[in-house]
């Protein structure tokens, strides 16, 4: 080391030999004392070097004699000056980074891990998946440090930080204001040395700079190419260039600011510490004057956005070959007036002398204009969430500008327009935050030159609108949130925005004194608004200009017509309305875009003329002298009651409608009647409709709810009479409320092909809750049967309908009904639950696995640290951002979903359990068993879900049983470790579902389903079931004839002679039609079975609706069986209510009302609120 300090070049040969000697001794650094390295103070060295540069040349460098010098300083003073001028352009921040890297490189020679001592590890961490890769802490990108684990480097890491995150280096060194912009290329070339000595024969400094500059990409190239991923080719190429630069600079000289750089660091790191040189001004393709009107798209650097029309244009397909021809063409075609005005009719202005700049995305927090800067070779990447709203940019500018700034005028001019976000105040270059100094705007190159152009963006209408975040061609109103189109691409404006203000928000237009003023009363928008208001038949109101020159215009909206006091929009079809007086549905037109109110007025004139007369008389009634009507309220176009402070009378249509809606809310949400006395609810009503008076709670409990209950009950009775074939099926069960009270429920199911009360839809299944009654805890089957028979008598048999099949999940109810005269079947979903629950309990290993999964999920739910770690691992491994599911042990479906979620998050669960020190760890064998359990339970969960839909029928049970049996057989070969569970599944299915395969009700339903027919039976079974179906059809026909004959006999008893005569002629009729009637049922069944089987997605009820005319008897028989649901689950879903209020059920009166509230809660949506 000491020998190296004494070495100095004497001539060319000696210099080369000395350099080789330096290289050899550099590898053997055992002689370097570690204590001296730790005490190195690079800041003091920097200050000493600065003093040396200002005071004079260092002694001993100009001669040829040998003296003791620091390593690396072996050039003449002229060479030092030449390269001192070159390296003086570097910022102090980059110098600090370079010196810190040198320090870490020297310290790495000690017996410690070298990879953790590089300054790059302040910004990176080692990838947990691959130790040869590192991950950036800011953008979470992964970079390779080399292929061989013994030869890794951090060159690419520091290169990424300098290119993609330069602000981090600025903040890290604490000298933000010292960072200077890179000078022009002409200033970078050092002056030709006066006496270069023999070194000029090796390589001149100018040639060196030119050669280095040719190897380094331009700032434009750096901006365009992606820096997120560094390929191996780029790394190798950068290393080769760096090595060349290191050799040439070693031959020529070194900077006085980097005394030990060539000695202590490898040559490849030298190039990383140096900055690339920009191209010349004439060669930059981004310095066209057209960039005054465009800025780079934040999503795609190959596209530019026009600041005038916000349209996006491509600058070329190849990211390395971009141009501005299309931008110039767009300006000349779409904005020719701006170009001519800007250049006095000469076309596009000449090129900039320097590249255009951008406004800084993040201004310094202290408000100092010169506190932030960036080198042009380290462009500050534009933030994706950069302000695009009209307010945000100007607020940032004004908050950071000093009052004395010369540019405050321009920024203030821009702050008057909230639409400045359209332009984004951007240029194609990446943002350079050199404060808001005159250099930032290139002596006003952007704002000063474009001041006239940007005046068009100062429309005052942007005080009330903001650009839509999802579509730049639309603007959002700040008052109503409506998204309004500003035009098509290439032709946008603010006319539609002003029109919206005049029509929807006239009070805003008139309330702002400085907004548009009275001078715009003669504008086209004012004329249009006034013409529209005068052309309205129901609101013939003139435009008013107040004495404060505030223009007020009437609101022209579909909701301002007085007719809307008597109608409400139908919830099922927005093109129809419902009359509040008679409940009739009236169409407003066929096209949703062209709806009117003429039909509504005709309906009132035809059926409710007295309402119009009453309204006219109320309007004509003079108001008291003390009552003052606001001018703006008169112009709002609302009803006469909205124009005054008078309260609605009780029979007013609006008051009746509001009261009805409040009663609906009480029923739908199971609210107590005292809810109407709540202060917040009353304040809301007072604000929304001050004219409305809220009735007392007793009105709702004694009048509104009982009246609504009676109306809904009558409507359901009328719907039941429309049932096809006159058969009603039922689902019944015991429902337990949240207060542990048990209720017996009865829900009706029927098929209706044509119902005027229901909107047209493909679903012909109808259902309604008939009754709810509380039962004692020690109820018996006989008491339940008596209660059901009472309900059937009240709802079904009294109206001439027939009681069909009853589906229940209660074994006691089913047994009692089967022993009597009623038909009952078990719920399919409940049977599947019993089968799966028994199978899970049959194997101890499966139970232990479920217990382990529950503990893990419970621990994660209770531990915030585990939740946070799980979310972090999900992001790291790109797993779905899902929470773990905690199951309910009594419901196997929740356990299945819990295991599925654990398998989905398997990788994260394993790592989280280790890092959070969980006692419960899932082994590999347990993961395999868990997957087998999920594979076994999945078909049963799918079957239960399929059979629980609103459109499922009894005909799907036999096909589903065959599918599950086949699936269980296959699971023996596909799974491992759960054979006991699979055998239990198979045995339980045989014991609980085998009888279903031969039940006549299920067999007839399957035969009459055009999707299955006899395809699931053997030939012998199919032939037998076909004959049974024919006999069932004949029996139904004979029963219907007897019923028809009894009705005819009840009409009146004729005389004996006439009766005998009728009997004679009836005998003749029977003789004529004897043979055909005997063959009719068989012919229908054979013709039906000969047709092809339909796809599974087809609706069988729609099929029988089409065949109703061809096979009326067979269609009626099919509806009898296909109208029955296979599961009680759809009915149970109707009772998913919020937590009941404690006041309900405390007395017998409240319990009766609770049953009525449940009845209304379930049935109001089923009848589409038409009552």
Swiss-Prot record:
Gene Ontology CC annotation, any one: nucleus
Positions bearing the Glycyl lysine isopeptide (Lys-Gly) (interchain with G-Cter in SUMO2) cross-link: 43, 489
Residue ranges covered by zinc fingers (BED-type): 115-172, 285-342, 456-512, 558-615
Subunit structure, interactors included: Homodimer; via C-terminus. Interacts with MYH9. Interacts with SAFB/SAFB1.
Predominant cellular place of this UniProt entry's protein: nucleus
Region (Disordered): 25-62, 362-405, 614-640
Stretches the record annotates as Required for homodimerization and nuclear accumulation: 1086-1171
Residues noted as binding Zn(2+) 2 in the record, renumbered to the chain: 306, 309, 330, 335
Modified residues (Phosphoserine): 624
Organism this protein belongs to: Homo sapiens
This protein's name: Zinc finger BED domain-containing protein 4
Organ and tissue specificity: Expressed in testis, heart, lung, and weakly expressed in brain, liver, muscle, placenta and small intestine. Expressed in the retina, found in the cone photoreceptors, Mueller cells, cone pedicles and in the innermost retinal layer.
Gene assigned in the entry: ZBED4
Keywords carried by this UniProt record: Activator, Cytoplasm, DNA-binding, Isopeptide bond, Metal-binding, Nucleus, Phosphoprotein, Repeat, RNA-binding, Transcription, Transcription regulation, Ubl conjugation, Zinc, Zinc-finger
Gene Ontology biological process: positive regulation of transcription by RNA polymerase II
UniProt biased composition (Basic and acidic residues): 36-51
């Amino acid at each position: 080391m000491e020998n190296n300090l004494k070495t100095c070049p004497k001539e060319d040969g000696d210099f080369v030999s000395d350099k080789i000697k330096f290289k050899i001794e550099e590898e053997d650094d055992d002689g370097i004392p570690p204590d001296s390295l730790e005490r190195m103070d690079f800041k003091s060295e920097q200050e000493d070097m600065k003093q040396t540069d200002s005071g004079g040349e260092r002694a001993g460098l100009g001669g040829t004699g040998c003296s003791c010098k620091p390593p690396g300083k072996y050039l003449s003073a002229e060479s030092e000056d030449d390269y001192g001028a070159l390296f003086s352009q570097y910022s102090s921040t980059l110098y600090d980074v370079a010196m810190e890297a040198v320090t870490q490189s020297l310290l790495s020679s000690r017996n410690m891990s070298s990879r953790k001592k590089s300054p790059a590890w302040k910004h990176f961490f080692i990838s947990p998946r691959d130790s040869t890769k590192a991950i950036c802490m800011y953008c979470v990108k992964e970079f390779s440090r080399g292929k061989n684990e013994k030869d890794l480097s951090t060159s690419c890491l520091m290169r990424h930080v300098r290119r993609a995150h330069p602000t981090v280096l600025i903040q890290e060194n604490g000298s933000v204001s010292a960072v200077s912009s890179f000078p022009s290329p002409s200033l970078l070339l050092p002056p030709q040395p006066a006496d270069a000595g023999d070194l000029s024969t090796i390589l001149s400094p100018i040639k060196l700079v030119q050669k280095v500059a040719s190897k380094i990409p331009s700032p434009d190239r750096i901006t365009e190419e992606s820096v997120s991923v560094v390929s191996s080719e780029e790394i190798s190429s950068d290393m080769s260039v760096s090595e060349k630069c290191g050799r040439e600079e070693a031959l020529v000289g070194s900077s006085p600011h980097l005394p030990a750089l060539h000695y202590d660091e490898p040559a490849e790191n030298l190039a990383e510490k140096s900055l690339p040189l920009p191209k010349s001004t004439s060669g930059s393709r981004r310095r066209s004057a057209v960039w005054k009107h465009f800025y780079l798209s934040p999503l795609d650097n190959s596209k530019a956005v026009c600041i005038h029309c916000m349209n996006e244009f491509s600058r070329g397909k190849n990211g390395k070959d971009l141009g501005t021809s299309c931008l110039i063409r767009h300006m000349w075609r779409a904005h020719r007036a701006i170009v001519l005005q800007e250049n006095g009719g000469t076309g596009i202005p000449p090129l900039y002398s320097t590249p255009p700049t951008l406004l800084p995305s993040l201004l310094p927090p202290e408000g100092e204009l010169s506190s932030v800067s960036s080198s042009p070779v380290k462009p500050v990447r534009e933030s994706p969430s950069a302000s695009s709203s009209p307010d945000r940019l100007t607020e940032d500018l004004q908050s950071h500008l000093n009052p004395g700034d010369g540019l405050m005028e321009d920024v203030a001019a821009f702050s008057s327009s909230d639409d400045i976000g359209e332009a984004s105040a951007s240029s194609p270059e990446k943002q350079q935050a050199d404060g808001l100094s005159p250099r930032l705007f290139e002596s006003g190159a952007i704002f000063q030159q474009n001041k006239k152009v940007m005046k068009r963006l100062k429309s005052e209408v942007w005080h009330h609108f903001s650009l839509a975040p999802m579509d730049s061609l639309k603007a959002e109103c700040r008052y109503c949130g409506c998204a309004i189109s500003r035009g098509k691409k290439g032709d946008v404006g603010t006319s539609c925005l002003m029109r919206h203000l005049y029509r929807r928000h006239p009070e805003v237009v008139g309330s702002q004194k400085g907004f548009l003023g009275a001078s715009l009363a003669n504008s086209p928008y004012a004329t249009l608004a006034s013409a529209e208001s005068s052309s309205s038949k129901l609101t013939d109101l003139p435009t008013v200009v107040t004495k404060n020159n505030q223009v007020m215009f009437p609101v022209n909206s579909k909701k301002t017509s007085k007719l809307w006091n008597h109608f409400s929009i139908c919830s099922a079809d927005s093109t129809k309305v419902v009359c509040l007086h008679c409940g009739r549905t009236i169409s407003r037109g066929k096209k949703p875009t062209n709806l009117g109110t003429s039909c509504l007025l005709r309906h009132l004139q035809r059926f409710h003329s007295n309402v119009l007369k009453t309204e006219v008389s109320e309007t004509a009634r003079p108001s008291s002298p003390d009552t003052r009507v606001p001018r703006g309220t008169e112009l709002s176009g609302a009803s006469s009651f909205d124009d005054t402070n008078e309260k609605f009378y009780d029979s007013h249509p609006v008051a009746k409608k509001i009261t009805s809606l409040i009663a609906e809310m009480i029923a739908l949400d199971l609210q107590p009647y005292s809810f109407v006395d709540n202060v917040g609810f009353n304040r809301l009503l007072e604000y929304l409709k001050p004219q409305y008076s809220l009735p007392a709670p007793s009105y709702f409990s004694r009048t509104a709810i009982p009246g609504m209950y009676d109306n809904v009950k009558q409507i359901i009775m009328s719907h039941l009479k429309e049932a096809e074939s006159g058969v009603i099926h039922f689902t019944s069960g015991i429902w337990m409320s949240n207060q542990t009270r048990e209720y017996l429920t009865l829900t009706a199911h029927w098929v209706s092909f044509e119902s005027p009360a229901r909107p047209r839809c493909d679903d012909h299944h109808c259902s309604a809750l008939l009754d709810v009654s509380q039962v004692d805890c020690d109820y018996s089957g006989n008491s339940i049967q008596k209660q059901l028979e009472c309900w059937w008598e009240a709802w079904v048999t009294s109206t001439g309908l027939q009681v069909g099949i009853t589906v229940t999940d209660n074994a006691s109810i089913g047994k009692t009904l089967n022993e009597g005269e009623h038909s009952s079947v078990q719920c399919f979903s409940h049977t599947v639950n019993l089968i799966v629950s028994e199978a899970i309990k049959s194997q101890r290993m499966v139970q232990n696995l479920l217990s382990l999964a529950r503990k893990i999920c419970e621990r994660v739910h209770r531990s915030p640290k585990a939740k946070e770690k799980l979310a972090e691992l999900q992001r790291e491994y790109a797993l779905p951002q899902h929470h773990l599911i905690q199951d309910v042990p009594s419901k196997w479906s929740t356990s299945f979903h819990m295991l599925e979620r654990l398998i989905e998050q398997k990788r994260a669960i394993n790592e989280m359990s280790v890092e959070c020190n969980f006692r419960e760890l899932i082994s590999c064998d347990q993961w395999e068993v868990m997957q087998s359990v999920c594979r076994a339970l999945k078909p049963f969960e799918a079957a239960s879900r399929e059979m629980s839909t609103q459109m499922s029928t009894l005909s799907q049970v036999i096909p589903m049983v065959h599918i599950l049996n086949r699936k269980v057989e296959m699971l023996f070969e596909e799974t491992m470790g759960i054979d006991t569970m699979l055998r239990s599944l198979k045995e339980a299915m045989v014991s609980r579902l085998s009888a279903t395969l031969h039940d006549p009700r299920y067999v007839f339903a399957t035969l009459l389903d055009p999707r299955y027919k006899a395809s699931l039976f053997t030939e012998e079974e199919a032939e037998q079931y076909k004959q049974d179906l024919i006999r069932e059809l004949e029996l139904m026909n004979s029963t219907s004839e007897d019923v028809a004959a009894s009705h005819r006999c009840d009409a009146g008893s004729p005389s004996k002679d006439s009766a005998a005569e009728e009997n004679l002629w009836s005998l003749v009729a029977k003789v004529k039609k004897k043979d055909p009637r005997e063959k009719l049922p068989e012919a229908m069944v054979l013709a039906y079975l000969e047709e092809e089987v339909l796809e599974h997605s087809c609706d069988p009820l729609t099929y029988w609706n089409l065949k109703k005319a061809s096979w009326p008897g067979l269609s009626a028989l099919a509806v009898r069986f296909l109208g029955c649901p296979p599961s009680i689950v759809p009915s149970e879903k109707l009772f998913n209510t919020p937590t009941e209020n404690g006041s309900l059920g405390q007395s017998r009166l409240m319990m009766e009302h609770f049953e009525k509230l449940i009845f209304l809660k379930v049935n109001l949506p089923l009848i589409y609120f038409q009552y």
